[in-house]
Structures are given as structure tokens and as C-alpha cells.
């Protein structure tokens, strides 16, 4: 009997201790949760936007001297959708939205010489200055490519935007050269592996492919395409300019372009190849310039989506133009609106300052495409 009573007492004692430990554990858990929730409550939440009924209009404002103008507010902007003024929203914390960037690089057509490791090519490539050519001849080595510093600059951009980068290359076909990554060293390493392509420059196909890559990214990310190419399309087969424009207008991505003219290099190569005494066809540059005026594909795509387009002729101008464009990407006002009259189809957009200022220049997308599912 005594053993039975003693066992009961021991059991109750053990249960009481367990209950005390449980209450203490619950109290500690409650304290931890309250601290975590308090900290989380103080953190700014990233902006989550549905593209079904919100049109993003990243707007760049520069002075006439080219400096980015800051300190404007949402009330300073007017957005008109097909002539109807809209209610403008300005994202006050753009740093909370990481960037997904696709860099599409032309390696075919006249860009292919950039990736051939032969010293003599630098003599006839328009990307190289005369001083660079002279130095290359002395050292008997290939000149550095115009985009030799791209890896370092992409690393800086990724660090400043908390972003991810993917690489696409193209000639007559399009290739995913590097999937999305936050590892800047991986991007730099892949850029050293660029090789020359064929005689194509399928710009429309490359933009189409890159846009679909960006569409696969989470909706809370800013999506940007940077196109590095010549101006004219050579050999696209998967899309047309009209359908691509519609596709881009229905998206909320930003497109910028860095273009070079292949004419100077082509004329130098043609002159080098001419037998002595043969006449040079002076109509060639005229025909080329007329065609370029009709088919400035890269610049036109950037203009529709409000992105900047810049030109380069060598490494120095490439570095400067790249820096200007990426500064403009980071320095944009992230404006948006919910359409009041979202009829399916194309809608022209006009962005302006409420109080007109002649010292400022605005750059923003010029249209969007409303789809059927918009309420």
C-alpha cells in the first residue's frame, strides 16, 4: 500500500514538473514570437502589384545637361491614357523591389569579329581607336573587345539593385547563354566564353525570347531587358515587329538598347578586299543609310517601352553609355496607374509634369496593351 501511495506521489510530482516546464516553454515561445513580429512589423513590406489591372510607367527625368532629376512627387506627374488623366501612384521604396535583368548580346553578323582571337582583326574593326590598333600591332595581340568591362559593370549593377542577371546571345538563332543568377562571378566568367556567331542578327527573335524569360520571373520584381546589338534586324523568323510590339506593350518591362553601326567596319573590309584599280560602289553607303533609317529596330523597341538607347563605337564609349543607361534604370520614378477605361487593345500613354518645365526632359513608355482579363 505504501509503495502504491509513493508511486502516485512521484507521478504527480513528475506531472507537476512537466506542467511547469511546458508553461515556461510556452512563455518563452510567446516572448520570441512577439519580438519577431515586432521586428517584422517595423520592416517595410515589398510592393506586390498585380499586372492584371496596374500599368507600370517607370519614368526617367533628366535635366538638359543629362543629370537625373530627383525629389519629384506623385502630384508633380500627369499620366494620360488615350487623353484621359489617370490617378498616379508613385512607389516610394523602389529599393524593396529587386531587379531581374536580361542582357541580350549580338555575337553574329558584324559583331562576330569582336570574339575572334586574332590580332590582325583589330586593324579593320570599327570598335577600335587608331591608338588601340597601334598598340595591338606592337604587342601582336588581339585588342580588347568593346564590351570587355561588361562583367565588372554588371556586378556593380547587381549589387546596387539586389538583382539577378541572365545572358542571352544571338546570331541567326537565339541561345540562353546563362540562366538567372545572383552570382556576379558566374556572369563575368561566362562573358569570357563568348564566341563568334554566324552571319545573322535576329534582333526581334532575341527580344522575343528575352521578354519571355523575364515574364517567368516573380511579379514583385522589376524586369529589364538590355539589348547590345546593331540597329537593323537580320534574319528573325519567330516574330514580327508588330506582334513583338504588342507583346511588349502588354507587359510591364523596361527595354533599353546599346547599339553600334556596322557600316564603318564593313566599308574598311570591302576596301581591303578590292583588287587594285577596281572602282568602289559609292551607292553602297547610300543604300545602307536609307535602310537604317527605315529599320532602326533596336532604338524603336526601346522608345516604345520608354527605355534609353545609346550608341557606342569603342570600349570607352561603351563603358560611358552603359553607365549612363544603368544609372537611368536605377534613377527612374516608379509610376503606375489603374486604367479607368481598360478597353482591350492598344492605349497611347502620355506622361508629363503638371507644371511644365523646359529644363527637364521626361522619358517613359508611350503605350500599353490592355488584355481581355482586365476588369
Spans of features found by a protein language model:
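Short alpha-helical segments used as structural interaction elements across diverse proteins
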Residues: 20-21, 37, 219
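Intrinsically disordered, low-complexity segments enriched in glycine/proline and serine/threonine
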Residues: 5-8, 13, 31, 133-137, ...
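Bacterial N-terminal signal peptides
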Residues: 25-38
Amino acid at each position: 500500500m505504501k509503495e502504491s501511495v509513493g508511486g502516485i506521489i512521484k507521478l504527480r510530482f513528475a506531472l507537476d514538473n512537466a506542467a511547469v516546464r511546458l508553461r515556461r516553454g510556452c512563455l518563452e515561445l510567446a516572448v520570441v514570437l512577439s519580438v519577431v513580429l515586432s521586428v517584422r512589423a517595423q520592416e517595410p513590406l515589398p510592393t506586390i502589384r498585380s499586372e492584371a489591372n496596374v500599368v507600370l510607367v517607370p519614368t526617367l527625368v533628366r535635366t538638359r545637361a543629362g543629370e537625373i532629376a530627383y525629389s519629384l512627387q506623385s502630384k508633380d506627374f500627369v499620366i494620360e491614357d488615350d487623353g484621359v488623366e489617370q490617378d498616379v501612384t508613385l512607389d516610394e521604396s523602389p529599393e524593396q523591389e529587386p531587379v531581374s535583368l536580361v542582357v541580350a548580346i549580338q555575337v553574329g553578323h558584324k559583331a562576330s569579329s569582336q570574339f575572334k582571337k586574332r590580332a590582325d582583326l583589330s586593324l579593320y574593326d570599327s570598335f577600335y581607336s587608331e591608338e588601340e590598333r597601334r598598340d595591338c600591332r606592337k604587342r601582336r595581340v588581339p585588342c580588347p573587345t568593346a564590351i570587355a568591362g561588361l562583367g565588372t559593370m554588371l556586378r556593380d549593377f547587381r549589387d546596387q539593385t539586389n538583382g539577378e542577371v541572365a545572358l542571352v546571345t544571338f546570331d541567326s538563332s537565339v541561345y540562353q547563354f546563362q540562366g538567372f543568377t545572383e552570382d556576379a562571378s558566374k556572369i563575368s566568367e561566362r562573358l569570357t566564353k563568348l564566341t563568334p556567331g554566324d552571319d545573322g542578327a535576329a534582333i526581334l527573335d532575341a527580344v522575343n525570347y528575352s521578354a519571355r524569360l523575364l515574364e517567368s520571373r516573380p511579379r514583385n520584381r522589376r524586369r529589364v531587358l538590355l539589348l547590345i546589338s546593331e540597329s537593323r534586324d537580320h534574319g528573325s523568323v519567330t516574330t514580327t515587329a508588330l506582334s513583338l510590339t504588342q507583346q511588349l506593350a502588354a507587359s510591364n518591362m523596361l527595354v533599353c538598347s546599346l547599339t553600334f553601326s556596322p557600316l564603318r567596319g564593313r566599308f574598311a573590309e570591302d576596301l581591303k578586299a578590292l583588287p587594285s584599280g577596281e572602282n568602289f560602289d559609292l551607292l553602297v553607303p547610300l543604300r545602307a543609310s536609307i535602310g537604317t533609317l527605315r529599320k532602326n529596330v533596336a532604338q524603336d523597341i526601346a522608345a516604345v517601352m520608354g527605355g534609353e538607347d545609346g550608341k557606342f563605337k569603342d570600349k570607352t564609349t561603351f563603358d560611358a553609355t552603359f553607365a549612363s543607361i544603368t544609372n537611368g534604370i536605377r534613377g527612374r520614378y516608379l509610376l503606375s496607374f489603374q486604367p479607368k477605361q481598360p478597353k482591350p487593345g492598344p492605349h497611347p500613354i502620355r506622361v508629363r509634369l503638371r507644371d511644365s518645365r523646359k529644363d527637364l526632359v521626361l522619358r517613359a513608355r508611350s503605350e500599353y496593351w490592355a488584355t481581355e482579363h482586365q476588369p
